[in-house]
């Protein structure tokens, strides 16, 4: 199931990330996964949150620079298990002509296993191929249930 991602541009200086996280915390929005890409003068923060629409609204109201071009990005979240190692998942996607644009892991653990967030060039096809290969993909509701 596709999972919505929130992306925010931040000035690259101490405390910028803390400001974003504090704003989400004050509004009781949980963060399930987070990554930061250094872009020189600024950073790009990508997050999976408990309520992406609310997180977007709260951050926009606080004048954070949300990545407009990445506003409605959805990602795949796969469960890494004994049978579904990262190597198997990336091989399945690559053999089917799918490119992984970026990946990051989730802070949510599922009975000792972790989730991997994947941005691929064709999400619908990736989800279908992963299902056909019996790879467990997670929805936002699945993540919420395991985080509680």
Regions found by a protein language model. Give the residues of each.
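A conserved regulatory-domain signal marking ACT and ACT-like small-molecule sensing domains
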Residues: 1-148
